[in-house]
From Swiss-Prot:
Compositionally skewed regions (Basic and acidic residues) per UniProt: 126-136
Protein name: Uncharacterized lipoprotein YerH
Pfam families xref list: CamS
Keyword field contains Signal: yes
Annotated region (Disordered), positions in chain: 126-155
Lipid-substituted positions (N-palmitoyl cysteine): C19
Membrane disposition: Lipid-anchor
One cellular component term from this protein's GO annotations in UniProt: plasma membrane
Species name: Bacillus subtilis (strain 168)
Cellular localization per UniProt: Cell membrane; Membrane raft
């Protein structure tokens, strides 16, 4: 159970917002969800937890390729950012006021796996066709060359596409029904490709240049659009494709989205790509980060030193910041502490709340501070951009 530490007039971490204009009202709505081939009853919840989130259709429908992202990406950091970042980017095309969210219903597990595979040629293709008469040679990753050593083959033809994610956005058709209004497709691309020459051998790495990754991502995106347009339900809806650069397995921060494109309803033409200038940065800063973001580096250093001075029983302060166009937009700080009693947790949290407001009072930055011990989460401090006062919770 949580005990709320009131600072000014704080409420819950996620405040219940008013209902949106597209799906307004203070009552649950029972509506009909229509597709090209069927219709079924659905419920629109009466509350939305935040303007930053979409309402979701009930009953909840799991994605047709559910779980594949977890299996295909390198770290939990990338898994989370790939999904939540795709929803964040969707808001540029599909307003949270006018659209409902639904996990992908048009790309099933078998389809996605076949697309993530390598293209087969020569004897590999003949073998696959012999083993499965219904085999479809749909791999979006390059085939391995027919000659050369295993190392030479993998170095020259790495796997570029690591994972694919579909999100569907539903829009009101009329007073009593909704229909598919748009689709987001995320393509997760490898910045580092890992392979083994033989089972049990040490893992080898192939670093992929940013320019190559972008070129291959755009090429794959065009083929994905061509294939999606052949599906009845996806012929005449806008589709946005976003390219995600997956971090290496050893990275302590997630990767980032690098570009996106919007394809108009009924079209297969990708006319242009919009660059996405965002990245995650770890604090305390290394030399490169300190040189690029000297002011932010100094703020974090002073924040950390202040904690060291007044509370020695902690084991470190680390932060992960999201930068958009080289400006900090979010800062998540994790502080593990040695637990000596609840009164110390309260005192530490009170002190930290003041420090957060002193050092991170810029209205454009979302700040979250998590205080933990060996027993788990002890407290959380949240100050969203524009808030005059933070929200604080101490856990019982």
């Amino acid at each position: 159970m949580k005990k709320t530490l009131a600072l000014a007039a704080t409420a819950a971490v996620l405040m219940l917002s008013a209902c949106s204009s597209g799906f307004g009202g203070e009552k649950e709505e029972e509506i009909t969800q229509k597709t090209a081939k069927s219709s079924e009853k659905a419920i629109v919840p009466k509350y939305n937890i935040s303007d930053s989130y979409y309402k979701m259709v009930l009953p909840f429908k799991a994605g047709k390729a559910r779980g594949l992202t977890t299996e295909q990406l390198n770290t939990r950091l990338d898994i989370d950012e790939f999904e939540t970042g795709l929803m964040r980017l969707a808001q540029d095309s599909f307003s949270t006021d006018d659209y409902l969210f639904q996990e992908g219903q048009y790309l099933d597990e078998d389809t996605v796996l076949s697309w993530l595979a390598r293209k087969k040629t020569g004897s590999d293709l003949k073998k696959a066709e012999k083993e499965d008469k219904n085999f479809k040679n749909e791999g979006l990753n390059p085939a391995l060359p027919s000659s050369g050593s295993t190392e030479e083959k993998n170095e020259s033809s790495p796997i570029y596409l690591a994972s694919m994610l579909e999100h569907d956005y539903l829009v009101r058709k009329d007073k009593n029904s909704i229909q598919l209004g748009g689709v987001m497709i995320g393509l997760a691309l490898n910045s580092v490709y890992y392979y083994r020459e033989k089972t049990g051998d040490p893992q080898k790495e192939v670093e992929i240049k940013d320019s190559t990754l972008r070129q291959q991502g755009e090429k794959i995106a065009q083929e994905v659009i061509n294939r999606l347009r052949k599906k009845d339900n996806l012929k005449n809806v806008p589709i946005t494709v976003a390219l995600y650069k997956q971090a290496s397995k050893t990275s302590i921060v997630p990767g980032n989205f690098i570009a996106k494109t919007e394809v108009k309803a009924g079209s297969t033409d990708i006319s242009n790509w919009d660059d996405i200038n965002e990245k995650y940065v770890f604090y305390p800063a290394d030399t490169t980060t300190a040189e690029k973001y000297p002011d932010d580096t100094e703020v974090f250093k002073r924040f950390k030193n202040s904690i060291e001075e007044y509370f020695p029983n902690y084991t470190g302060v680390v932060g992960t910041a999201l930068y958009e166009n080289d400006e900090m937009k979010k800062m998540k700080i994790d502080i593990p502490m040695q637990f000596y009693g609840k009164s110390e947790v309260v005192a530490f949290t009170q002190f930290l709340t003041g420090e957060v407001m002193d050092y991170y009072s810029k209205s454009s930055v979302d700040v979250e501070v998590n205080i933990t011990s060996s027993d788990g989460q002890e407290a959380v401090i949240i100050r969203n951009a524009g808030d005059k006062e933070p929200t604080v919770h101490i856990y019982d």
